[in-house]
Amino acid sequence: MAMKAVCVLKGDSPVQGTINFEQKESNGPVKVWGSITGLTEGLHGFHVHQFGDNTQGCTSAGPHFNPLSRQHGGPKDEERHVGDLGNVTAGKDGVAKVSFEDSVISLSGDHSIIGRTLVVHEKADDLGKGGNEESKKTGNAGGRLACGVIGIAQ
């Protein structure tokens, strides 16, 4: 049976958006789609963080969701956090249209992202290839512009 989830992104900045998730089979890929507005043109890191806690804004969401204790990487890398979804690309109008599939995240089981926080960052994620310690943890993606807790949808 297909599972669906949704995340409404908000923050202290004008950045906001809605991201949808759908997984047709429990061990199948997750389709991710939606849009984010209010961004500066270019790439912005896009990650699932460990906690669904937004009491202190996006900072209380903790580090990237990483149940396998791996180093940070890109979405197509073998070595990556479960929550490493790479970058979204905003056009001149400040809008990022999101549409991709990911086979590492899940909407159920040990790698479930339900109840965790999705974050869009101020800078591009270097996908762990930045040549310093921070790159292997965060991808040097900078501050957290907007976030939201991923919840079950109809």
From Swiss-Prot:
Q: Which residues bind Cu cation?
A: H47, H49, H64, H121
Q: Which GO terms describe its biological process?
A: auditory receptor cell stereocilium organization; embryo implantation; glutathione metabolic process; heart contraction; hydrogen peroxide biosynthetic process; intracellular iron ion homeostasis; locomotory behavior; muscle cell cellular homeostasis
Q: Which cofactor does it need?
A: Cu cation; Zn(2+)
Q: Does the keyword Disulfide bond apply?
A: yes
Which reaction equations make up its catalytic activity? 2 superoxide + 2 H(+) = H2O2 + O2
Protein name in the entry: Superoxide dismutase [Cu-Zn]
Q: Name one GO molecular function term.
A: superoxide dismutase activity
Which residues of the sequence carry a binding annotation for Zn(2+)? Answer: H64, H72, H81, D84
Q: Which residues are modified to Phosphoserine? A: S99, S103, S106, S108
Q: Which family does it belong to?
A: Belongs to the Cu-Zn superoxide dismutase family.
The listed locations are:
Cytoplasm; Nucleus
Q: Which Pfam families match?
A: Sod_Cu (PF00080)
Tell me, what does this protein do in biology?
Answer: Destroys radicals which are normally produced within the cells and which are toxic to biological systems.
Name where it mostly resides: cytoplasm
Give the encoding gene's name: SOD1
Modification sites for N6-succinyllysine? K4, K10, K92, K123, K137
